[in-house]
Design a protein with these regions (language model features):
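Glycine-rich, highly charged phosphate/nucleotide-binding loops
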Residues: 58-65, 86-94
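Short acidic-hydrophobic, aromatic-tinged amphipathic segments that line or gate anion-handling sites
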Residues: 1-9, 78-79
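A glycine-rich helix N-cap at a beta->alpha junction
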Residues: 65-66, 70-80
Length: 289
């Protein structure tokens, strides 16, 4: 079922609609150029996102994407279930968008493809619509195109600082803290434990410097994403120690931002050896601007 999610209340459709075309699994640097162009004419800005696509895990969950889009200044998201649109011809796809929103502007990248067998192109849009069409060149960083595929490759390698260059913000997850075995508390490092969201593309397992916001305050910290071999626990979790925080986070939803990769996960000979390493990890984090 097609679904429109309004990110701001009481939209005024008389403003017109500028529609961004693409997959929009989050917003990378190229997408943000499209958004800037769409906002130039004072219209409402909408973008589409594909739900349940053929490319496997997404970079962000639906709530995470909506947060990114809203913070970037978009007004609405048009959610398109892949199963419902995969057989539409390019013309049928274009007609669907015009029927739903009567846009006065389409904005896309030069590599945008759509419709059955991806036969639709920016030139096709220009030929078959009377709507203004803006086609922007691809954005490159260090000589390589910015894309979701590139971001996923970097995540698989733990290169989250380069991911930030591509996304223009830190890679993050949002999840609810649950009560676990409280091993961290026992050794002096209480952690907020979150299950990695189902369907979200996994980053490389390891220990990361992270930033977590609680009640409007950002806390530096360290996050173990993966198993806990020192305690013979192979469950994959996201365990975050918030430096300087005291309080109960159970049941609360947290946003954890991954700042940089610190080290691989390893099995220590004892809890004391692990504690010594964690103290070294947090010292590195405190000294990092």
């Amino acid at each position: 079922m097609l679904k429109t999610v309004w990110l701001n209340e009481q939209p005024n459709m008389k403003q017109g609609v500028a529609m961004l075309l693409g997959g929009f699994d989050g917003l990378h640097a190229g997408h943000r150029k499209l958004l800037e162009k769409a906002k130039e004419n004072g219209s409402l800005v909408g973008l589409m996102t594909i739900i349940g696509g053929k490319n496997g895990e997404s970079l962000f969950t639906n709530p995470e994407r909506e947060l990114i889009f809203k913070e970037a200044g978009a007004d609405f998201v048009f959610e398109l279930p892949f199963a419902e649109i995969k057989n539409l011809s390019p013309l049928e796809f274009l007609q669907m968008l015009e029927r739903e929103f009567s846009p006065n502007m389409f904005v896309c990248g030069e590599d945008f493809r759509f419709g059955l067998q991806a036969k639709g192109t920016p030139n096709f849009i220009k030929e078959y619509t009377q709507v203004r069409v803006e086609v922007l060149p691809l954005v490159e960083i260090n000589g390589e195109k910015v894309s979701a595929t590139r971001v996923k490759r970097l995540l698989s390698e733990g290169r989250v600082e380069e991911v930030k260059q591509c996304l223009t913000h830190d890679f993050f997850l949002i999840g609810e803290v649950f009560a676990d075995r409280k091993i961290g508390r026992i050794i002096g490092f209480p952690t907020a434990n979150i299950l990695y969201p189902k369907g979200k593309y996994p980053l490389k397992k390891g220990v990361y410097e992270t930033r977590t916001v609680v009640n409007g305050k950002a806390y530096k910290g360290i996050t173990n994403y993966g198993a806990r071999p020192t305690f013979d626990d192979e469950t994959v979790l996201t365990e975050t120690y918030l430096d300087g925080f005291s309080g109960d986070l159970y049941g609360k939803s947290l946003k954890v931002e991954f700042v940089r990769f610190l080290r691989e996960i390893k099995k220590f000979d004892s809890a004391e050896a692990l504690k010594k390493q964690l103290n070294e990890d947090i010292a590195r984090v405190r000294n990092h601007d």
